[in-house]
Design a protein with these regions (language model features):
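N-terminal capping/lid subdomain adjacent to the active-site entrance of alpha/beta enzymes
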Residues: 1-172, 179-186, 191-193, 307-327
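Catalytic core of soluble alpha/beta enzymes
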Residues: 149, 154-290, 304-316
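Short helix/strand-capping turn motifs
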Residues: 293-296
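Active-site cofactor/co-catalyst pockets and adjacent glycine-rich loops in catalytic enzymes
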Residues: 300
């Protein structure tokens, strides 16, 4: 039977608001694809992201551009060259993996030859606010032992220090989303070098020609600067020593698997990350948890509501998806 591609959109309200250096969000628009293939229906979700010049309309249009190939039975392998590494390809790639798992009667982790995924501690994100408010939120989030702090400028250092005082049991990820300059980064590293900081995520704009001292603590993690495996040698030479792999950036589970595997082999600390989205967007990455040193899949926790049959979150941990959700 010929496949049928169905494209839908959904808007998820944020629990409160989600503020990072470049924007404040109250609603998260996502694009979901379904591939109908006789007895099977598979799914994938992506998040159009303004930072990469994506909108719901542009992503939908790009997915539509390969409708005939999808409905004619394109393989996961051929999809990699049919679309660039981006959100559109992510949704389709994940749906094709889900379809193969259903048809083969095997979980995606088995198809990849990986260890069975297990429940993992996930980082929990605190969006930008005053130091007192962020410290209070950190105390409220006592079940989460790893906290990701969004900062928008050098004043965010005060919030970091306030949270370290309020939650001495926690380890932190500092995420500046490209908001600092080199002098400010040096100040942040000097202030935090003796504290339990896993890494500082994308402190400088991704397109700045710069290098980091890999011996300086905390180490630097690439987020906006990382998209595909081809970026890894350059990032290593620049002094990045950690990578945040997101399926919406790299173009799906196929490339996410290669990124985590190759990055780990090169010596990077690896993080399985996400855009804010539903459990359907998190589920594919949970299949790769054995390749990740750090899990940052808290997207559904930041929403007012999640998709049906979503991931289980409890006591700071996230569990792998049930087959009714994905994979």
């Amino acid at each position: 039977m010929r496949r049928q591609l169905v494209i839908t959109t959904q808007v998820y309200p944020v629990a409160g608001e989600f503020k990072i250096s470049r924007s404040t969000l109250t609603h998260i628009p996502v694009v979901m694809v379904e591939i109908h293939d006789g007895a099977y229906v598979s799914r994938g979700e992506c998040r159009p992201y303004k930072r990469y010049n994506q909108t719901v309309e542009s992503v939908t249009e790009e997915i539509e551009s390969v409708r005939s190939e999808i409905e004619s039975g394109i393989s996961k392998e051929a999809l990699q060259s049919a679309l660039p590494a981006n959100a559109s390809r992510n949704a389709l790639d994940c749906a094709l993996w889900d379809l193969e798992a259903k048809k083969m009667g095997k979980a995606v982790w088995e198809l990849l030859g990986l260890d069975k995924p297990k429940a993992r501690e996930t980082a929990y994100t605190l969006s930008i606010n005053t130091p007192d408010e962020m410290a209070a939120k950190a105390v409220e989030s006592a079940q989460h032992k790893t906290l990701k702090l969004k900062i928008g400028n050098i004043s965010g250092l005060d919030a970091c220090l306030a949270i370290l005082e309020a939650r001495p049991d926690a380890q932190l990820i500092i995420d500046a989303n490209e908001a600092l300059n080199p002098d400010e980064l040096k100040q942040v590293q000097n202030e935090l070098s003796d504290h339990p900081i896993i890494f500082i995520e994308q402190p400088l704009p991704a397109d700045i020609e710069t290098s980091f001292n890999p011996q300086q603590q905390p180490i630097i993690c690439a987020d906006e600067a990382l998209h595909t495996v081809d970026d890894l040698p350059r990032l290593w030479s620049q002094g990045y020593r950690a990578i945040n792999v997101k399926l919406d950036k790299c173009g799906g589970l196929s490339s996410g698997y290669q990124l985590l595997k190759t990055g780990k082999a090169m010596g990077f600390k690896t993080m399985a990350g996400c855009m804010v989205g539903s459990s359907l967007a998190m589920a594919p990455m949970m299949m790769l948890e054995s390749l990740a040193d750090v899990i940052d899949l808290d997207g559904p926790l930041l929403l007012k509501e999640d998709i049906d049959k979503g991931l289980t979150y409890k006591n700071g941990k996230v569990w792998p998806p049930i087959p009714a959700l994905w994979g």
